Amino acid sequence: SSTCIPSGQPCPYNENCCSQSCTYKENENGNTVKRCD
């Protein structure tokens, strides 16, 4: 009963995302965080 993570939210793996794609993005602080595409 796992729900998918919406676009723009932090994610551990591709499979966790509704889009099935979790990639590194740079946030406003200049830190790199994996988020759903």
Curated annotation (Swiss-Prot):
<keyword id="KW-0528">Neurotoxin</keyword>
<keyword id="KW-0960">Knottin</keyword>
<keyword id="KW-0108">Calcium channel impairing toxin</keyword>
<feature type="site" description="Critical for insecticidal activity">
    <location>
        <position position="10"/>
    </location>
</feature>
<keyword id="KW-0964">Secreted</keyword>
<dbReference type="GO" id="GO:0090729">
    <property type="term" value="F:toxin activity"/>
</dbReference>
<dbReference type="Pfam" id="PF06357">
    <property type="entry name" value="Omega-toxin"/>
</dbReference>
<dbReference type="GO" id="GO:0006952">
    <property type="term" value="P:defense response"/>
</dbReference>
<dbReference type="GO" id="GO:0019855">
    <property type="term" value="F:calcium channel inhibitor activity"/>
</dbReference>
<keyword id="KW-1015">Disulfide bond</keyword>
<keyword id="KW-1218">Voltage-gated calcium channel impairing toxin</keyword>
<feature type="site" description="Critical for insecticidal activity">
    <location>
        <position position="35"/>
    </location>
</feature>
<keyword id="KW-0800">Toxin</keyword>
<dbReference type="InterPro" id="IPR018071">
    <property type="entry name" value="Omega-atracotox_CS"/>
</dbReference>
<feature type="disulfide bond">
    <location>
        <begin position="17"/>
        <end position="36"/>
    </location>
</feature>
<keyword id="KW-0872">Ion channel impairing toxin</keyword>
<feature type="disulfide bond">
    <location>
        <begin position="4"/>
        <end position="18"/>
    </location>
</feature>
<dbReference type="InterPro" id="IPR009415">
    <property type="entry name" value="Omega-atracotox"/>
</dbReference>
<protein>
    <recommendedName>
        <fullName>Omega-hexatoxin-Hv1b</fullName>
    </recommendedName>
</protein>
<feature type="site" description="Critical for insecticidal activity">
    <location>
        <position position="27"/>
    </location>
</feature>
<comment type="function">
    <text>Inhibits insect, but not mammalian, voltage-gated calcium channels (Cav).</text>
</comment>
<comment type="similarity">
    <text>Belongs to the neurotoxin 08 (Shiva) family. 01 (omega toxin) subfamily.</text>
</comment>
<dbReference type="GO" id="GO:0005576">
    <property type="term" value="C:extracellular region"/>
</dbReference>
<feature type="disulfide bond">
    <location>
        <begin position="11"/>
        <end position="22"/>
    </location>
</feature>
